[in-house]
Amino acid sequence: MNPLSAVFNSVVLVLLALGVTDVFFSYESSRCSMTYMFEYPQYLQIKLSKKVSRLYPLYELYLYGEGSYAEENKNLTLTGVPVLFLPGNAGSYKQARSFASVALRKAENIGNRYHFNIFTVNFNEELVALYGGSLRRQTRFVHECIKTILSLYKNQTFPPESVAIIGHSMGGLVARALFTLKHFKPDLINVIITQATPHILPVLSTDIYLTDFYTMVNNYWIYNSLKLRNITMLSVAGGYSDYQVRSGLTFLPTSSFHTSALSVVSSAVPITWASTDHLSIVWCRELVLVTARALFDLIDEHTKQINIDPQSRMSVIKHHFVRHPAKHLESRHQITASFTETPKFTLVEDSKWTYTVNKESNESFFLFPLLDKRIAYSHFHCQNTFLYTHSWIFGCNKTVSPKCLQINDLSWETELLPSAKVVNLKLDVYSNLSHFILYIPATNGSKFSVECEFLSEEARTVHVPVTHVLSFGFSSSHAPLNSSGLLYVIQFEDFSKIYQAFNVFIVRNCGQNKESKSSIYKFHVPWSHEDLIGVLSDELPVRISAKLHAEQPQNDNRLVKLFLYASPECLHEVTISTSFSQILGQIVRFHGIYLPVYIVANLLLAYGAQLHSILIQGSCMDLDLSFDVAAKPYKVDPVLIICKYLLNYKWFKNYWDGLMLPQLDAVQLHAYGFWFPLASLFFFIFGTSIAYWSSIGLQAAVRILSSLWIYLKRPSMFPKESKCITYRVYAETLFFAFISWRSCGTFSLLLVFLRYLSKVLILYSSMKNYVSLNAHIVKDTSSKQDSVKTDSDTNINSNQLTHHQPSSLEIKALDDCLKMHFTILHLNLWIVLLGLPSFIYWLKTLRYTIQLDPDPNRVSALVLIFILEILMNSTTSAIKSSVCLKTAAVLQLPLSIIVVAFGTLHLYRISNLIAFSLFLHVVCCFV
């Protein structure tokens, strides 16, 4: 082991561990509360047709109910609005309980004017995120469920013609996949709400069925956007707390024709303002309440079904999930208002104004003239805390209505924040108005405050350049806010990349003033709905983890902003500095799943170096030394960078397509905004370190197991070279092939791996035993001790070597074989690891069927079984004189390049490329 390599790879591994720690542990504690219920949940199974039950014996459809509602609906005389819940990966149909219970309580609160019937599908908790072979089957079953659900409403006055769908995780993707079915009518679905659904790409592209399913669904929605424009889509992500599905994957693929789609992060959802993990997004009370309110507002009061107007539906969704004006949606049409008699106005001519009520107040109207303010100021900003009225700010044009009897309700421009309602009105937009009117209702025993000011946006905007990524947090940018304003806007310059991450500290100092109101911050990303909103504390500075879920679009010049709704009695200071650990976390969050690609690429380079050393030196190099020699990023990355660059030219693209080569994965990642120039370099180095230390760890495991093997069964014969193909090889190949064909391909590969491991253990134990035995005999001979004990030991040892006394050359040849077998074993291990998702799925369904169908690894497993069985009996001496050895050694570099080029988004291709690499070795054994 080279000490420098060990130290370097250790440091790299520590950096990777820091990134992993940031992803899995460095997020805010959950601010979600549990939903609660008053009655025990009941799930009434809906009887499906015999044909459907026969085709999908593992799937079921249920209707949710509680108490008297469940009893009333036992005969399935339904009168509500149908909503279908689709669970996701390993999800239970009982996850519908939280939303269904809240919806039932809300229906009771409004006197059951209308209500929802919540249906839920039992997918048998299938692991569809790991195995894509059952996604089409689930999609077809959901289609049958929708037809069955709608048939239950035939006797209604206004029977529903469509179903609203709530899909969690992969259930949301299944909902979108319904439209790809040949005989599916798009009118059967009007609203789809997905929760933590990876829409753009699979989290793990473990098999071809999964990637093909994604390609089919996304292409259909892009190419048929006009046809699907009446479908209202909402995708809700969990934020940084959801480390299983990062939020960037949940953003819906956009199209200029499909405008009825919206993607938000739960931390930006009004009233929720909390990040959720992958499971809590289903039961988070704050988010469930918002979802329930939105669905109730989607109902048309005349038909008591979901509104058929897609624009109205989208306005409802945006009202609840983007910007909540603290007003009921049902009064949206009331833009204008009027007074029957002239109210008593109080004229306010100051640029700053505060009104505080501690106990009681009379109804008041405050009039703010605009004419003399338009020159010096650009905006009128107001904040109120605990003022419980929906309409509180109006506009008046005294030219049209001299006594301001006709007014415009401007409260729709209000934004609801955690402890306040704020409004920021641009004076140029309201050039037709002469006055703003502030309405204070009569109160008794209420305590609230209202603060308003005219401000200049330019004077209140602070431009702060972010610190460089490589500053490692040693430098920072400061923005002291020493004036007594209500609103400040801090614009972060050059903050647009996904690999950027910063700590933003906000210090608030109110001195001795203990009665100051709260200050609120909003970290706003203008090109996606991923805002972070919170309240400042007087005791400790607030730290905001400023990073992006989505990269800035190419033609978007807007800047990331921090809005600070301040208390005028307090001083504030904003400091921003680079967070190195969060940068590593962003790299791992966006690209960590691609690590197996770079690990295998490094192993193939090291494997090629070993074959080359056999060709040149006649002996096999140690695997850890071969990493030092061959695992260099400049051998792989430049080729990919050049290809990616040339693909921008039409002539090269035509040549590429003429060779029928698949799309370069880096090009696709760049198109999604998930790639940056040094990503491949970083992960190649990470892959080298993992491959290096995993090889050392595997060697240590082999040593420990071999010691146990020697203790249990001491080898008595020195292993001799044998033919690559024997009757035993035929028998084992047929046995493992039968298992692969009748059960699961990865299961057979796991058995082959264990068989190969036993082969390596036997070889290592034999070499270790004979090396130690020879050393012991030499020591006894040189010392010339004639004690009885020594003589007896020597006789015993000599008897063990009676049949064959190995020479140093034979032991050296065995050592070379072990080095080569160990590398092949390591590659075999990664073949098994990459196939584990389908193996886990097969284990879960083993009680229903013994055969995995379809099996993504069956054919490749059959090929690999034959290859590995031959390689088990191969030796380095057998390939030294091979005419194909040089070709096999040279081709490992192109193979490693191909692994990175085409395996990043298609992990299942890696096993096939490893199989081809090992096949070249097999050829060397015979040619």
UniProtKB/Swiss-Prot annotation:
The catalytic activity of this protein is classed by the Enzyme Commission as 3.1.-.-
Q: What is the lineage of its organism?
A: Eukaryota, Metazoa, Chordata, Craniata, Vertebrata
PANTHER family named in the record: GPI INOSITOL-DEACYLASE, NEGATIVE REGULATOR OF VESICLE FORMATION-RELATED
Q: What class of enzyme is it?
A: hydrolase
Protein known as: GPI inositol-deacylase
Q: Which residues are glycosylated?
A: N75, N155, N230, N362, N397, N432, N444, N482
Topology relative to the lipid bilayer, per the entry, is: Multi-pass membrane protein
Q: Which GO terms describe its molecular function?
A: deacylase activity; phosphatidylinositol deacylase activity
| Family assignment from sequence similarity | Belongs to the GPI inositol-deacylase family.
Q: Which GO terms describe its cellular component?
A: endoplasmic reticulum; endoplasmic reticulum membrane
A Gene Ontology annotation in the biological process aspect, one of them, is: endoplasmic reticulum to Golgi vesicle-mediated transport
Q: Where in the cell is it found?
A: Endoplasmic reticulum membrane
Q: What does the UniProt function comment say about this protein?
A: GPI inositol-deacylase that catalyzes the remove of the acyl chain linked to the 2-OH position of inositol ring from the GPI-anchored protein (GPI-AP) in the endoplasmic reticulum. Initiates the post-attachment remodeling phase of GPI-AP biogenesis and participates in endoplasmic reticulum (ER)-to-Golgi transport of GPI-anchored protein.
Q: Which UniProt keywords apply?
A: Endoplasmic reticulum, Glycoprotein, Hydrolase, Membrane, Protein transport, Transmembrane, Transmembrane helix, Transport
Q: Topology: which residues are Lumenal?
A: 26-595, 694-733, 843-858, 909-927
Task: Give the Cytoplasmic membrane side ranges.
Answer: 1-4, 617-672, 755-821, 880-887
Q: Which residues cross the membrane?
A: 5-25, 596-616, 673-693, 734-754, 822-842, 859-879, 888-908
Q: Where along the chain is the active site annotated?
A: S169
